[in-house]
Amino acid sequence: MYLFFDTETTGLPRNWKAPVTDLNNWPRLVQLAFLYYDEKGNKINGSNFIIKPDGFKISTEVSKIHRITNERALSEGVPLKSVLDNFKNILSQSKYLVAHNMSFDEKIIGAEFLRINMTNGLNGKKKICTMEQSTNYCKLEGPYGYKWPKLSELHYKLFKTVFEESHNAEVDINVTAKCFWELKKINVL
């Protein structure tokens, strides 16, 4: 069983190499979307949550990127513990975790588990990063060889259609899943 997930946050970390336990370094979770698929690629279910801010605010600058304002999150948001309980329930049934930029998303979720004293359910799972594992397939030149493809670049390489990254976890995770199953079909994964 495959669990695809994506996050939107209050910003970026100050130090990308900091451990997940450095809670002051890792931004807060604003949106979590996830999809659960069987081994054959059939979607079983999915969820999308906006997190109710508790102890943090969503800046105007960041809300321009993902369109989730502090006011919207306060009115529509769900408490973090409820969201993580729901996620952890699906996580416990999953064999593989899939994300585009796994190292970022797993640290965001891991830090939130720690903030509310929950066991990090991501540990011990097999992880597949569509960004890292499609680098040689996409062959996009960067300053030090091939660069990691953006989700939109991977989508274009696979389907020859433009996808504007939405910075909406629900939209992005559906595109990630579409790309993943195509990468499996053509034996890149």
Regions from the PLM with identified roles:
Residues M1-L3:
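Extreme N-terminal starter segment of soluble prokaryotic enzymes
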Residues T7-N15, V20:
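Short acidic, Gly/Ser-rich segments with clustered Asp/Glu that frequently serve as metal-coordination loops
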Residues N15, W26-N70, K88-L189:
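Metal-dependent phosphoesterase core characteristic of DEDDh/y 3'-5' exonuclease domains
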Residues L74-Q93:
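Catalytic-core regions of hydrolytic enzymes
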